[in-house]
């Protein structure tokens, strides 16, 4: 694996939690600037989401929720990944997504679920975030 030592290697990609609190779009911009081809993280299997949850539980300092790369760009309940990968796996927390007050269009990992389940959230909320890169 070619991942730097504090990144999680998985399926040919590398993942890292950043504890700095940012709004969703700023977090995506940060990941993209980190290295070409980087994005907020995407997930495609239950196994991946468990491994990520374990990694975040081990390395995340603080209690903040964690942004991932899923968003409802068109605001029409069509969730998509910023890396344009296939939206083939969704693991929402119960009663989510609810697009509460028609304002929640970005997706976070919920700390109370051990970072295993997802919630839609107001994109301007400040969260920690998970970048995914190829090195």
UniProtKB/Swiss-Prot annotation:
Residues 10-132 form the C-type lectin domain. Keywords: Calcium, Disulfide bond, Hemagglutinin, Lectin, Metal-binding, Secreted. One of its GO terms (cellular component) is extracellular region. CDD domains: CLECT_REG-1_like. Beta-galactoside lectin that agglutinates rabbit and human erythrocytes in a calcium-dependent fashion (MHC is 0.21 ug/ml on rabbit erythrocytes). Galactose (15 mM), lactose (20 mM), rhamnose (20 mM) and EGTA strongly inhibit this activity. Belongs to the true venom lectin family. This is C-type lectin APL. The lineage of its organism: Eukaryota, Metazoa, Chordata, Craniata, Vertebrata.
């Amino acid at each position: 694996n070619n991942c730097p030592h504090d990144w999680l290697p998985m399926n040919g990609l590398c993942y890292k939690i950043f504890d700095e609190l940012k709004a969703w779009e700023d977090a995506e911009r940060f990941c993209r600037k980190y290295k070409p081809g980087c994005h907020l993280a995407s997930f495609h299997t239950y196994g991946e989401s468990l491994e990520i949850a374990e990694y975040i539980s081990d390395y995340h300092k603080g209690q903040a929720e964690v942004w991932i790369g899923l968003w409802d760009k068109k605001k029409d309940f069509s969730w998509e990944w910023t890396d344009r990968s296939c939206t083939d796996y969704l693991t929402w927390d119960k009663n989510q997504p609810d697009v509460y007050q028609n304002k929640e269009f970005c997706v976070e990992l919920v700390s109370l679920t051990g970072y295993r389940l997802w919630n839609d959230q107001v994109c301007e909320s400040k969260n920690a975030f998970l970048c995914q890169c190829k090195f």
